[in-house]
Amino acid sequence: MATGGYRSGGSTTTDFLEEWKAKREKMRAKQNPAGPGSSGGDPAAKSPAGSLTPTAVAGTSELNHGPAGAAAPAAPAPGALNCAHGSSTLPRAAPGSRRAEDECPSAAAASGAPGSRGDEEEPDSAREKGRSSGPSARKGKGQIEKRKLREKRRSTGVVNIPAAECLDEYEDDEAGQKERKREDAITQQNTIQNEAATLPDPGTSYLPQDPSRTVPGRYKSTTSAPEDEISNRYPRTDRSGFSRHNRDANAPASFSSSSTLEKRIEDLEKEVVRERQENLRLVRLMQDKEEMIGKLKEEIDLLNRDLDDMEDENEQLKQENKTLLKVVGQLTR
């Protein structure tokens, strides 16, 4: 073959393959010094330059269909020599071929003759697959999750709450909100009634009333109507969130209303005590007057009897006077 000038593409590919296979065999001999590849020599180096062995064809196919990251083999320079078999061609290999072989050594080793390394990698991969996907792996994953859940519970003391308890919480919130609304309504009603009672008209007389009797009957419809409207207007889920929001928002208002309610209750109790004392005083006056009336009635009865006696005496005296006049008239004759 010519030593310089333009060379055909077939000879260039053949020389590159021969150099690549020689280097591969050398690397395989370094990895497995006792293997059959080191003692058998290089069968591809003995083949003629014009003919391609099956292994060479496989190598070319693997090189052409290699990974995307591997660099394409560069053609040697026109002045490069075109013959050299064996290990002597390794130093003269093109830099492009070295780069390609360095970037994909694993693909070259796997595509060659079936060696001991490929045989060892297959059971290893099978073992790894068996470890990753099997009942033991699922069991280990479940144990890890249980351990994490235990650690969470241990650190915080919080247990997962089922949905039923959440619904119970919402219902409790609704009940508490209804009670607060009812108390607020009763408080407002009591304040209105007490203000109306403490400011009577000057021309009218003051009559004490019991607020416990008058309040429920008068304001029963007003307290029950908003609850019915809320229950009809909002579903259960909306009412739960609405009640919780209102409870958080009306917390200071409820505290102030409770304090005012307590003060109002104390004032009402004092007022009730005063009214009871006044009532007792009036009852005593009425009893005294009734006693006086009874005594006066007895005196009137006595006077009526005396009057009757005096009328009888007067009639008797009139009769006596008539008789005396008759006697005197007879005597004068």
Swiss-Prot record:
Residues 293-333 are annotated as: Leucine-zipper. Residues 186-196 have a biased composition (Polar residues). The keyword Transcription regulation applies. Residues 1-262 are annotated as: Disordered. Residues 175-185, 235-248 have a biased composition (Basic and acidic residues). A motif (Nuclear localization signal) lies at residues 138-154. A motif (B30.2/SPRY domain-binding motif) lies at residues 62-66. The modification Phosphothreonine is found at T156. Homooligomer. Interacts (via the C-terminal region) with WT1. Interacts with THAP1. Interacts with AATF. Interacts with BACE1. Interacts with SPSB1 (via B30.2/SPRY domain); this interaction is direct and occurs in association with the Elongin BC complex. Interacts with SPSB2 (via B30.2/SPRY domain); this interaction occurs in association with the Elongin BC complex. Interacts with SPSB4 (via B30.2/SPRY domain); this interaction occurs in association with the Elongin BC complex. Component of a ternary complex composed of SQSTM1 and PRKCZ. Interacts with actin. The leucine-zipper domain is not essential for apoptosis, but is required for sensitization of cells to exogenous apoptotic insults and for interaction with its partners. The SAC domain is a death-inducing domain selective for apoptosis induction in cancer cells. This domain is essential for nuclear entry, Fas activation, inhibition of NF-kappa-B activity and induction of apoptosis in cancer cells. This is PRKC apoptosis WT1 regulator protein.
